Regions:
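Single-stranded nucleic acid-binding surfaces, predominantly the OB-fold ssDNA-binding core
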Residues: 1-81
Length: 81
């Protein structure tokens, strides 16, 4: 896995759900538009997913530190800009 540092805007509603029979308890997913106009999918799990669902909304500008896994970025840390 590769580490990534991303800056951009949340462009979709944040989808939140619970996971059964997994090492993770909850998951948040949204699409993210980078400064250079590329769109990527972002996943977050557990406490980070709870934070994202409760504090962030569509249109927020954020900075993401995460890991690239296939075509998706898994969030390690996130900060509102």
């Amino acid at each position: 896995m590769n580490e990534v540092f991303l800056m951009g805007k949340i462009i979709t509603c944040i989808k939140f759900g619970f996971i059964i029979n997994s090492k993770h308890f909850s998951k948040a997913t949204f699409n993210f538009k980078l400064v250079d106009e590329q769109v990527i999918q972002i996943n977050a799990y557990d406490k980070i997913a709870d934070y994202i669902y409760s504090k962030l909304k569509q249109g927020d500008n954020v900075f993401i530190y995460g890991k690239l896994c296939k075509n998706v970025v898994n969030v390690i840390k996130i900060k509102i800009l």
